[in-house]
């Protein structure tokens, strides 16, 4: 994230967290934020629409209200209208991710980004959760999964700046390096 984006994203995310805490809605807002991020990921057209500076704010508001309906909390809807009014709606995804990071910090939860060759089942996710808990001081572990067949097998787990590479691709790379040193 650029410095300018950080200067925009962090205050809005902190304000959203403050509002959520004051109304005891941190978990509801987290649900709403995840839904919004999914909408942005799944609909490049919507992302482009809200980010287009040529489109009038009133048109953006109407589309956002129509699209979300009653799915999000009214306070979250008001926050989105504020972002549109201030011309900051293009930062919605980053603000949402920063909000989730603040919530994880508040709840002493770590994010484990797991890359595997196939979709993980619940037992595998629970095993990873327990392993990550034992490695960190976190009370809870949130898992974000990504499927990447190029790792050939195994998993890659990223926790903050720490990476645990137990993929077949990583093992082959390490074997190749050790053979070169012989």
Swiss-Prot record:
Keywords: ATP synthesis, CF(1), Hydrogen ion transport, Ion transport, Membrane, Thylakoid, Transport. GO terms for molecular function: proton-transporting ATP synthase activity, rotational mechanism. The keyword Thylakoid applies. Its main location: membrane. F(1)F(0) ATP synthase produces ATP from ADP in the presence of a proton or sodium gradient. F-type ATPases consist of two structural domains, F(1) containing the extramembraneous catalytic core and F(0) containing the membrane proton channel, linked together by a central stalk and a peripheral stalk. During catalysis, ATP synthesis in the catalytic domain of F(1) is coupled via a rotary mechanism of the central stalk subunits to proton translocation. This protein is part of the stalk that links CF(0) to CF(1). It either transmits conformational changes from CF(0) to CF(1) or is implicated in proton conduction. Belongs to the ATPase delta chain family. This is ATP synthase subunit delta. It comes from Trichodesmium erythraeum (strain IMS101).
């Amino acid at each position: 994230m650029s410095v300018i984006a950080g200067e925009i994203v962090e205050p809005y995310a902190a304000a959203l967290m403050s509002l959520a805490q004051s109304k005891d809605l941190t978990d509801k807002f987290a649900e709403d934020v995840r839904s919004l991020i999914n909408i942005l990921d799944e609909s490049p057209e919507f992302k482009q629409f809200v980010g287009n500076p040529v489109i009038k704010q009133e048109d953006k508001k109407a589309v956002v209200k129509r699209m979300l309906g009653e799915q999000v909390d009214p306070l979250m809807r008001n926050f989105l209208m504020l972002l549109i009014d201030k011309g900051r709606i293009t930062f919605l995804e980053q603000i949402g991710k920063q909000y989730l990071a603040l919530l994880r910090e508040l709840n002493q939860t770590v994010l484990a980004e797991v890359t595997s060759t196939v979709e993980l089942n619940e037992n595998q996710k629970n095993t990873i959760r327990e392993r990550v808990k034992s490695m960190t001081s976190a009370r809870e572990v949130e898992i974000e999964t990504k499927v990447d067949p190029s790792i050939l097998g195994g998993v890659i787990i990223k926790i903050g700046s720490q990476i645990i590479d137990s993929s077949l691709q990583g093992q082959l790379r390490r074997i190749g390096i050790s053979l070169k040193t012989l």
